[in-house]
Structure formats: C-alpha cells, structure tokens
Swiss-Prot record:
Reactions accelerated catalytically: N-terminal L-lysyl-[protein] + L-leucyl-tRNA(Leu) = N-terminal L-leucyl-L-lysyl-[protein] + tRNA(Leu) + H(+); N-terminal L-arginyl-[protein] + L-leucyl-tRNA(Leu) = N-terminal L-leucyl-L-arginyl-[protein] + tRNA(Leu) + H(+); L-phenylalanyl-tRNA(Phe) + an N-terminal L-alpha-aminoacyl-[protein] = an N-terminal L-phenylalanyl-L-alpha-aminoacyl-[protein] + tRNA(Phe)
A single BP term in Gene Ontology: protein catabolic process
Lineage: Bacteria, Pseudomonadati, Chlorobiota, Chlorobiia, Chlorobiales
A Gene Ontology molecular function term of the record: leucyl-tRNA--protein transferase activity
Pfam families: Leu_Phe_trans (PF03588)
Organism encoding this protein: Pelodictyon phaeoclathratiforme (strain DSM 5477 / BU-1)
Keywords linked to the UniProt accession: Acyltransferase, Cytoplasm, Transferase
Domain of life of the organism encoding this protein: Bacteria
Record's keyword annotation contains Acyltransferase: yes
Entry's EC annotation: 2.3.2.6
GO terms under cellular component: cytoplasm
Function recorded in the entry: Functions in the N-end rule pathway of protein degradation where it conjugates Leu, Phe and, less efficiently, Met from aminoacyl-tRNAs to the N-termini of proteins containing an N-terminal arginine or lysine.
Protein's UniProt name: Leucyl/phenylalanyl-tRNA--protein transferase
UniProt xrefs under InterPro entries: Acyl_CoA_acyltransferase, Leu/Phe-tRNA_Trfase, Leu/Phe-tRNA_Trfase_C
Length: 194
C-alpha cells in the first residue's frame, strides 16, 4: 500500500505515482517537462459555454469521488490499459476521506457521465485524471474546477504529462526548474479547498 505521508511528500517534491498496467507496480514519476494550466488565461471553448448556458449537465463537487476514480480507471475506447491500480484507488480514497483529494462530477439526467479528481496542497492542485461517458462531460467538470481554483486563489494547476486532450484544453509545458519554482511558491499558500 502507498503510505499517505510518502505520497504527500512526493507531491511536494514534484513527483506523482503511476501504476504499470502489466505488473501494477507503482512508480514515482517526475517528468522533465510538466503540463500546467495558466489559471488566469484559461478560457472555456464556445461549446462548453453553450452547454453551460443550456444547463445540459449538473456539476457537483465531492459528491461521488469513488464513482469518479473508478470511471477514470476504467478502460477507454482507444486505450484498454490504465495506470490507476487498486492500490492507487485505495490511497486516493484515503486522501479524499482526509479532505485532500477532491472530485468534480458531471451528471446528465441523474447519471454520472464524467468527472475528474486530484489533490489540493497549499495553493497547488494536482489534476490526476478525468473521464467522460458523454461528449463534453469531463470538459464541463474541468471548467468548474478552473473557476473554483481561481475563486479560491490557487496559483498552480498541475496536469502532469502533456497529451492531446490537455493541449486542446489549453495546457502548456514548462521546464522542470520552472515547475519546481512555481510549485514551491504555490505550496507556501494556505488555502482551504472547500
């Protein structure tokens, strides 16, 4: 099992865990380039704004953490492997019970159709994963996360490793040294997530 104190210490040092889908062993990752979101310059897409105005989705915070992390761990259309092992689910569920890990959930007609989860430390939020069972469900949840972080005064939204989906949402890559500088600054802030 991943020890909670070890997990939190790793985040403060710029590491995050990933499980190997073949052996489920947990590895500590610290990529040379880090994907982050500039909270001040984030702008939702027109489609997200349209769906938000239409109130097609209902978004909640910390209502269904277990459903979100299991949705993130489930196989996807183009990728049947997952880095989210049972050990990782157990650790983040414990962090959630301690008020450190949080989820945003997107609901459509009463059904959980998307969401994301991550952990909050100081003025940093570490986005772990997102999932969507209906078009735009994870983007709507992400939009709510960004506005929540802005409202609370967060400085850093860490998305870890760049991928095409994060790039479409507006993530940028920064060098390791710059990431560590931003992380150190963000961790000095005292912010209550809820």
């Amino acid at each position: 099992m991943i020890r909670i104190d070890e997990l939190l210490r790793a985040y403060r040092r710029g590491y995050f865990p990933m499980s190997d889908p073949e052996d489920e062993k947990v590895y500590w990752c610290q990529p040379y380039k880090r994907a982050v979101f500039c909270l001040d310059s984030y702008r939702p897409s027109r489609d997200v704004l349209r769906l938000t105005r239409k109130k097609e989705f209902t978004v909640t915070l910390d209502k269904e953490f277990a459903g979100v992390i299991k949705g993130c761990a489930a196989p996807r259309k183009n990728d049947h492997e997952t880095w989210i092992s049972d050990e990782i689910i157990e650790a983040y569920t414990k962090l959630h019970s301690l008020g450190i890990a949080h989820s945003f959930e997107s609901w459509y007609q009463g059904e959980l159709v998307g969401g994301l989860y991550g952990i909050a430390l100081g003025g940093a939020f570490f986005g772990e994963s997102m999932f969507s069972r209906r078009s735009y469900a994870s983007r709507i949840a992400f939009d709510h996360l960004v506005f929540h972080l802005r409202e609370k005064g967060y400085l850093l939204l860490d998305a870890q490793i760049m991928n095409p989906h994060l790039q479409r949402l507006g993530a940028v890559e920064i060098e390791h040294e710059e990431y560590m500088r931003q992380l150190a600054h963000a961790l000095q802030k005292k912010i209550v997530f809820l």
